[in-house]
């Protein structure tokens, strides 16, 4: 039987036949509907093939994969759990505990600087001889820097890692310590696209390299930092593209052989939300896997509740994300997991070419500092950021638990953290949820007909309003319009939405508005335009609520109208 099975063959399906079947499934809509675009405008096709890859990239594929694999020095990565505490004693206790439970590095954020005791620094110095240290954004007055003076000169060559900050200078004895950070996180968190992130890293490098006479000495001093978002394949391609771009950059400085710099990635707070915080754990898992498959060397996973204040349990969850990846997926046994993927190779090349061109534009404008001072970067980032917020508001992109599937039973946790950033995608929803948690208007869904007919629209409206923190009640299912009119007249509510099946909406609303009580804000579920919509508004209907509408604008409109009613009694 098995020999017979081995003889089974399958007909080869060519692209043309696949496309023909795909077009039929679209039922008259154009094939181009299956093509989406990234925030940079790069087209994402529904199918990538070997033939298409060879046609568009040719021998570039081999060059890309060779570079990615040769410049990744190990097949694993360092688990770098960040430690945040209010005192040096707590910091050391938390750090020691995390190192015993799977953390592989000492991570200190100078933005959350604390006062250090001599005893704590002494304990830290001992650990630095065993574990790599990543201390970022230090200020000259930060007491943390004193630890480097406490390590015996004969032991300093054992210390490895990174320390960055203003006017931070280390003894030459620290031969394995890097002091320069090429950082794309700021533009990323402000809403940037991947092409801009990559180009900015190269521009920073070009400016910093001017202070060195030898490229190898320069390379030995730097680390590259990325924030990794939830766009899985795009983020994989970002890290891969950087390795190729860096090799090209190094070769232009006369470097021979393969050039490699360590990449430190962290989960992106741009995608984190204070709402339904456990969803952040899913985002962190997605982002972590993308970073690892992309080839990061060091990875920091932020706890799911980092925006409101992490605790021992959430830090454990964050650490376990990486431990699960290492122990249960074997991703640390392979270099360049996605190499050869038609989609990833194509996307990687797109980023390489576009980022290099943009980097050259920046250089022509005078380099990194001149470009920053010109305001051109902020203009570009702002445009991308506004598009991101618009996509979230119009539900073109999903933030689970925030702009879709909002859980009103989940408590809104209040709290602050030094890692709070200015342009998180969830912020507009968080503000609305916080507002309506304090005071809630009475909202009624005015349902007409059979449950099976009005339920789809009623469920949509309920979910739509929940994203802003608004709870709803259902009216009785009115069998007649007159029954609905009487109920509306005799029932107190602040805002109502008429929910009827699409087929019956026109008939029901036309009759309903003939005797609609004044002074009540009532919308219709569904998108209606033209003369019909105008007539309904003239008859007392306030507006409409529909799929694809700007949620934030609509929710703020409801909020504003209710505030006016409350204000004027």
List where the protein language model places each region.
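Catalytic alpha/beta active-site cores
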Residues: 1-231, 261-262, 310, 451, ...
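Intrinsic disorder at enzyme termini
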Residues: 8-11, 29-30, 35-36, 45-47, ...
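Exposed alpha-helical structural elements
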Residues: 17, 21, 120, 146, ...
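A short alpha-helix capping/helix-coil boundary motif
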Residues: 72-75, 222, 265-268, 337-339, ...
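Active-site lining segments that contact anionic ligands and/or coordinate catalytic metals
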Residues: 219-221, 258-260, 296-298, 356-359, ...
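Active-site capping/gating regions of soluble enzymes
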Residues: 225-257, 262-414, 543-553
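A short beta-alpha structural unit
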Residues: 306, 341-346, 445-451, 484
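Generic hydrophobic alpha-helical scaffold/packing signal
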Residues: 322, 345-348, 352, 359, ...
């Amino acid at each position: 039987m098995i020999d017979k099975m081995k003889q089974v063959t399958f007909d080869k399906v060519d692209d043309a036949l696949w496309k023909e079947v795909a077009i039929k499934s679209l039922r008259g809509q154009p094939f181009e509907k299956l093509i989406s675009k990234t925030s940079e405008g790069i087209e994402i096709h529904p199918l990538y093939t070997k033939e298409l890859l060879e046609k568009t990239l040719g021998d570039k594929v081999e060059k890309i994969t060779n570079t990615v694999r040769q410049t990744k020095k190990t097949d694993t990565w360092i688990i770098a759990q960040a430690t945040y505490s209010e005192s040096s004693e707590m910091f050391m206790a938390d750090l020691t505990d995390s190192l015993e439970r799977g953390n592989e590095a000492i991570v200190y954020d100078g933005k959350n600087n604390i006062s250090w005791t001599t005893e704590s620094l002494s304990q830290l110095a001992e650990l630095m001889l065993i574990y790599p240290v990543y201390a970022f954004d230090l200020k000259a007055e930060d007491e943390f820097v004193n630890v480097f003076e406490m390590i015996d000169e004969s032991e300093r060559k054992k210390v490895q890692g990174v320390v960055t900050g203003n006017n931070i200078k280390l003894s030459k004895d620290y031969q394995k310590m890097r002091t320069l950070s090429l950082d794309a996180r700021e533009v990323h968190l402000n809403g940037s696209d991947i092409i801009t992130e990559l180009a900015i890293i190269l521009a920073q490098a070009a400016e910093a390299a001017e202070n060195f006479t030898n490229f190898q000495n320069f390379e030995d001093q730097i680390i590259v930092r990325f924030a990794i978002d939830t766009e899985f394949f795009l983020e994989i391609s970002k890290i891969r593209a950087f390795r190729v771009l860096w090799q090209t950059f190094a070769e232009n400085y006369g470097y021979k052989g393969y050039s490699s710099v360590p990449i430190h990635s962290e989960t992106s707070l741009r995608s984190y939300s204070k709402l339904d915080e456990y969803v952040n754990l899913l985002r962190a898992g997605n982002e972590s896997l993308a970073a690892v498959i992309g080839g990061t060397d060091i990875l920091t996973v932020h706890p799911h509740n980092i925006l409101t204040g992490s605790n021992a349990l959430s830090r454990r969850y964050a650490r376990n994300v990486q431990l699960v990846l290492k122990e249960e997926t074997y991703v640390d046994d392979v270099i360049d997991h996605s190499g050869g993927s038609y989609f990833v190779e194509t996307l990687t090349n797109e980023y390489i070419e576009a980022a290099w061109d943009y980097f050259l534009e920046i250089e022509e404008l005078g380099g990194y500092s001149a470009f920053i001072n010109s305001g051109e970067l902020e203009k570009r980032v702002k445009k991308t950021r506004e598009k991101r917020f618009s996509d979230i508001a119009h539900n073109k992109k999903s933030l689970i638990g925030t702009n879709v599937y909002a859980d009103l039973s989940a408590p809104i946790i209040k709290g602050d953290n030094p890692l709070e950033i200015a342009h998180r995608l969830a912020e507009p929803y968080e503000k609305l949820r916080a507002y309506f948690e304090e005071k809630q208007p009475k909202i009624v869904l005015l349902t007409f007909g059979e449950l099976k007919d009005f339920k789809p629209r009623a469920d949509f409206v309920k979910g739509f309003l929940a994203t802003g923190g608004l709870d709803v009640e259902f009216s009785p299912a009115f069998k007649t319009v007159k029954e609905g009119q009487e109920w509306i007249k005799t029932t107190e509510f602040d805002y109502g939405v008429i929910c009827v099946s699409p087929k019956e909406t026109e008939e029901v609303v036309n009759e309903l508005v003939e005797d609609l009580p004044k002074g009540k804000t009532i919308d219709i579920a569904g998108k209606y335009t033209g003369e019909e919509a105008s007539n309904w508004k003239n008859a007392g209907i306030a507006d409409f609520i529909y799929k694809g509408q700007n949620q934030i604008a609509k929710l703020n409109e409801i909020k504003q109208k209710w505030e006016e009613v409350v204000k004027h009694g």
